[in-house]
């Protein structure tokens, strides 16, 4: 898991990702929280991940994404082995967009075209990692915001 500190501009005008990474987990993996002030997007590379929040329960499988509001109590776990990219995000329009998409489609989405979706997740994770230690951090904030918007 990695962390990044968004600029004041990113906090006010862009989507930004303060935490991100790739996890490979077994059935011991379980996260249960009362809430944190962020939203979460997950892309399943292989395996499956179960999610429970806001009166809904769903299971995301390989090639699918999960989206939910982490400000509400939530729990997610893997029934077996799972490999996934993930990032917490926030910023302009995050609340409204997350509410709209989860009300319309639920917690798990099968996006089309799926081929580029995994690349967008990689862009977020790698741009955030690269931006943490270089003079290109502000440029990467824009790339991250564009990639998050493309995924949504």
Model-derived segments and spans:
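Generic protein-terminus/edge-of-domain signal
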Residues: 1-61, 72, 78, 95, ...
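Solvent-exposed, well-ordered amphipathic alpha-helical segments
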Residues: 48-52, 59-63, 83-85, 113-118, ...
């Amino acid at each position: 898991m990695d962390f990044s500190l968004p600029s004041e501009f990113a906090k006010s005008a862009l989507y930004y990702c303060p935490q991100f990474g790739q996890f490979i987990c077994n059935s011991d993996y379980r996260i249960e929280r009362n809430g944190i002030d962020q939203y979460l997007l997950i892309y399943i590379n292989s395996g499956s991940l179960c999610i429970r929040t806001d009166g809904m329960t769903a299971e995301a499988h390989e090639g699918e994404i999960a989206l939910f509001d982490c400000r509400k109590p939530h729990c997610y776990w893997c029934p077996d082995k799972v490999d996934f990219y993930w990032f917490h995000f926030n910023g302009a329009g995050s609340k409204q967009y997350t509410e709209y998409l989860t009300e319309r489609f639920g917690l798990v989405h099968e996006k089309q075209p799926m081929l580029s979706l995994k690349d967008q997740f990689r862009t977020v994770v790698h741009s955030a990692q690269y931006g943490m230690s270089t003079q290109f951090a502000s440029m990467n904030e824009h790339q991250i915001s564009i990639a998050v918007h493309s995924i949504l």
